[in-house]
Amino acid sequence: MLRSDVLVVGSGAAGMYAAIAAARAGSNVLLVDRSLIGRGGATVMAQMTVAVAVGEEEPDHWEHHLADTLKAGRGLCDADLSQLLCEDGPACIREMDEWGVGWARRDGHMAQVHAPGHDRKRCVYVDFLNTGPAVSKTLRARVQRTPEIQRVGDLVVTELAIRDGMCVGAHAVHTPTGASVPIAAKATILATGGLTRLYARNSASINMGGDGYALALRAGAELIDMEFVQFFPIGHLAPRLVGMDPIMWDPFRYKLGGRLLNSEMKEFLPEEGRYISARDVATYGILKEVAAGRGSPHRGAWLSFQHCSEAVLREAFGPVIDRLAANGIDLTRQPIEVAPIAHYHMGGMRAGADMQTTVPHLFAAGEAVGGANGANRLSGNAITEALTFGRRAGERAAALAAKIPMPAIDPSSGFSSNRSKINPAAEIVRLQKLMNEHVGPLRTQGGLERALQEIRQMCGDLPAPRAGLDPEWMDLHDLRNMRLVAECVTRAALARTESRGAHQREDFPETSAAWERHQTIRV
Amino acid sequence: MGTPPDHPRLSARLKIRRGGSFESFEVPFEQGQTVLDGLRWIRAQRDPSLAIRFSCINANACKECMMRVDGKTVYACTTRLVPGEMRLEPLPNKKLIKDLVTEIAPPDERLR
């Protein structure tokens, strides 16, 4: 049995910032992760920029950032959460700067670039393609230097512990041994990220199968806006790259523009070499070109930087150009192929601006929270959201923990008695294909209904793990959560009979004023 | 990743150390695919009990998929499959947990 004032589940930027903030506010903290601490989440993979109104490149104010965020959200942002993101962003970014993250600088100030959907140069970054790893490393170092934070990796939370309707901790399994580990906590923060692993084409780590949503749902919490899955339009498609995040072309386009072309080598978005199309618009545009028979050979679009000389490429991306060469790619001579890839989830746990969910003493932070970005997230808001929401959740969880006694929890975790004979690794692949095909960026009633039917037939049982590392159990665990979360996304997508932002219904192509509202899910 | 229409299918024999012995799997692949792709294929198509460790899949960000391939310590996610036999073993200097998985967490981040 483990005990702590504050339990933080997930050690990406949101979880680590939450742990630091809670410790700073006087709590002892247990930070757990199913992978290694600070290496397995989405943050470490972020290669792009961070939107924040620090006004170093040109005058700015968080209210301008908020206006852009609300506009991008297509009428569905929870304005309180959006404001928290934009208003607290500068303080968090400057604190990260003090901790040595190394934001790129120009003429003595933070360099900021102009990303699509922003009204000015607002996005800070770490060269070269190193934003996420630098953020992770910086927070990891702070966490390591905070004695009030106990870190435990290889610990997967299988269920939240609920007593009298309140969260009192969690049940976990130590994956190398299969041992059950109950955790008593006065306050629990889920910083488990999003659900992009549900899709065959995704830019996620293996941990992004929607664990937090499934835990919260089974504990009685409300989820919101689950139909809004953001596809990043220009994820790498071909030729095969290794050792690079598929999102890498985003910073290339920030710095160098680049031309997005169809099979006739014509631009099909009104860009003229500028990187200005919103993500939902570009995703839709590429898929429509493919549907019209004007896609690239692997059913995407061409992206060309052939207007750039070797010297220009090297100045902008230094060692990355060598890594591309090692993959056989010379951008001065060839375009590459790109296509939409599941990247981020706008929906998630419903939380107030104090980050508490609808279950008392259960908090959420980062991408796991739904609502701040409405129906379409603005470029650069994800890391800002992770930092600001993490900090707020940590502070509020610590304030709660200071006022209440340590709860008792029941040591049993309740696994099912049957172990299914399926190959759960294969079932996960099947689910990912199904979601990509029918619950991806273009949706129809028929496709969604077919997906829902298949999802509901998939295995949702979780037996106890065998002693020692049990890889099949891990897959059964993931399949159970992914299946539940996939059902939420599909049902919400089926019910929303309009198109808005990341949710595009081919059978309901118009945006409907009557649908300017949220859908919530609770079991 | 999609398959170009004219690409030949290749095959690798992954000889994997599982405890005291080796087990071999024939793995079809396309030019450019990695050892990690091959291991994930084995788990989904042949044997889900095979223990491997990775998190970020292809970005070489998490550094969890380190193992020995043909006697050299590499990342499975950046090592390309080649036709013929490839010998896969767990890291020799770490405590073995199962198959290709070793104890790589820092000591102060383990369950005590």
PLM regions and their residue ranges:
Chain A
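Glycine- and aromatic-enriched mobile tails/lids
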Residues: 1-2, 25-27, 36-38, 45, ...
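Residue-level detector of alpha-helix initiation sites
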Residues: 12-13, 36, 195-196
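N-terminal Rossmann-like FAD-binding beta1-loop-alpha1 element of flavoenzymes
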Residues: 6-31
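An anion/pyrophosphate-binding glycine-rich loop and adjacent beta-alpha core
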Residues: 215, 221-330, 334, 396-403, ...
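Conserved redox-cofactor binding core of oxidoreductases
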Residues: 39, 92-179, 191, 235-239, ...
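Glycine-rich loop(s) and the adjacent beta-strand/alpha-helix scaffold that form part
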Residues: 187-240, 295, 380-396
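Core beta-strand elements of the Rossmann-like FAD/NAD(P) dinucleotide-binding domain
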Residues: 2-4, 178-187, 358-359
